[in-house]
Amino acid sequence: MQFAGKKTDQVTTSNPGFEEEEEEEEELQQDWSQLASLVSKNAALSLPKRGEKDYEPDGTNLQDLLLYNASKAMFDTISDSIRGTTVKSEVRGYYVPHKHQAVLLKPKGSFMQTMGRADSTGELWLDFHEFVYLAERGTILPYYRLEAGSNKSSKHETEILLSMEDLYSLFSSQQEMDQYFVFAHLKRLGFILKPSNQEAAVKTSFFPLKKQRSNLQAITWRLLSLFKIQELSLFSGFFYSKWNFFFRKYTTSPQLYQGLNRLVRSVAVPKNKKELLDAQSDREFQKVKDIPLTFKVWKPHSNFKKRDPGLPDFQVFVYNKNDDLQHFPTYKELRSMFSSLDYKFEFLSEIEDDDDWETNSYVEDIPRKEYIHKRSAKSQTEKSESSMKASFQKKTAQSSTKKKRKAYPPHIQQNRRLKTGYRSFIIAIMDNGLISFVKMSEADFGSESVWYTPNTQKKVDQRWKKH
């Protein structure tokens, strides 16, 4: 029989074992942190006390019970928490069906630095893949609206909140969905992407503008191009055939293999700036249907400008191997794609860093560096002389500490040429949702001496020393 007082915590019992249990509970260390956080109004938030780690099962259900209580507390906290977004930070995007684009009436966010195009009214227009990407990451709320604009008299009933399933159903084709998957994957990695068919306000190109030739010059150039065979003259074209082996005698095996250069017809791969410019001038006479590349890709950097992005670092072509409407590019189409490349060619030894690219790229048929200097002339005149001197000293200090391209030995340079090639682009192959990136590059194995030449003189000297 037990008796408990109303004003005291003392408990009397006739069982002596109960007193021993009470003494053990008093000796245990009690955790008052949770109770103190409830009592104190200004108490700092802290993690609850954790128990001792069990290194092996103890044969009871105590561990399962502790895990169940912990997971239940977590799910109860999540389910009972207040969900929503701050009205001030909410950004709504409206899908425009007849343009297959989206518009943000009140755009704000860091994504505006690399995505979208602003119009004169201050509204930001997004491509559909940009719209889906921002909605998928939770940056904007997607709405369906028949007429989007700055009309304030539009009713709220015309705005329908779209789910991700609704957005995916708005893709016009499987090819567009494949392009979005590649776009979203590279954006999550931090790259900056723009469609290849979307020109910036300031177009930068590695090649200067072509001068229009007269009809007589065009006809003459076309006739001469017919007789141009891999840097061989017209008179040596006869020996560019199997008859070469009848008119010339070969006494050694190396001569025979070297003669294959004239027998096997190959393609001249541009290896420097001059050859690139010559190949671009010959491209206007090719009558091959161009396959446009899909994306221009820039490495992430803080000075990127949508109006003047500069030359891209990579160019990507998206191909779905399971789509019957698409096909892998043929040899002629690949040749045309290589000739249409316009990016920062990494194999050029004449260009060592980004500053050299500003000099070797063109905007409106003038070097990009000169164009930037003219554009910033107005802002420079407004600056004081002291700030101009400080900026000049800063630029000279940066140029003096500029790292140049590392020089490699000849055999390593040859391995790099054989491995990476020259002009290149990336093919993003879609296979049932899986993306594989394959680098397609031009190589010139025929001009590289890949055979081994033993140094017999050293072996003879070593044998002579032994004897």
Curated annotation (Swiss-Prot):
Residues 18-29 have a biased composition (Acidic residues). It is found in: Nucleus; Endomembrane system; Mitochondrion outer membrane. Residues 401-413 have a biased composition (Basic residues). It is a peripheral membrane protein. GO terms for biological process: tRNA-type intron splice site recognition and cleavage. Residues 1-32, 374-413 are annotated as: Disordered. Its main location: nucleus. Transmembrane segments: none annotated. GO terms for cellular component: endomembrane system; mitochondrial outer membrane; mitochondrion; tRNA-intron endonuclease complex. Keywords: Membrane, Mitochondrion, Mitochondrion outer membrane, Nucleus, tRNA processing. Signal peptide: none annotated. It holds the Pfam family tRNA_int_end_N2. It comes from the Eukaryota. Non-catalytic subunit of the tRNA-splicing endonuclease complex, a complex responsible for identification and cleavage of the splice sites in pre-tRNA. It cleaves pre-tRNA at the 5' and 3' splice sites to release the intron. The products are an intron and two tRNA half-molecules bearing 2',3' cyclic phosphate and 5'-OH termini. There are no conserved sequences at the splice sites, but the intron is invariably located at the same site in the gene, placing the splice sites an invariant distance from the constant structural features of the tRNA body. Belongs to the SEN54 family. The tRNA splicing endonuclease complex is present with 100 molecules/cell. Present with 531 molecules/cell in log phase SD medium. tRNA splicing endonuclease is a heterotetramer composed of SEN2, SEN15, SEN34 and SEN54. Interacts directly with SEN2. This is tRNA-splicing endonuclease subunit SEN54. It comes from Saccharomyces cerevisiae (strain ATCC 204508 / S288c) (Baker's yeast).
